[in-house]
Amino acid sequence: MKIDEVRGMTPDQLNEQLVALKKEQFNLRFQKATGQIEKTHRVDEVRKDIARIKTVLRAKQAQA
């Protein structure tokens, strides 16, 4: 997910996306622990996407 895509979202959309990514991160952690994960790079991608969303949410809250 690109930062421009994240900045274009509303706070409600960002919160929904954040919840979805946290669920995915939880599932990926279990897959990694059991050795079932195929795309290991996805763990890092999800973590960085969560950070991007949190950063943009924080910036939007500071503006309001």
Swiss-Prot record:
CDD domains xrefs: Ribosomal_L29_HIP
GO biological processes: translation
A Gene Ontology molecular function term of the record: structural constituent of ribosome
Any GO CC annotation of this UniProt entry: cytosolic large ribosomal subunit
Keyword Ribonucleoprotein applies: yes
Record family assignment: Belongs to the universal ribosomal protein uL29 family.
Name of this chain's protein: Large ribosomal subunit protein uL29
Gene name linked to the record: rpmC
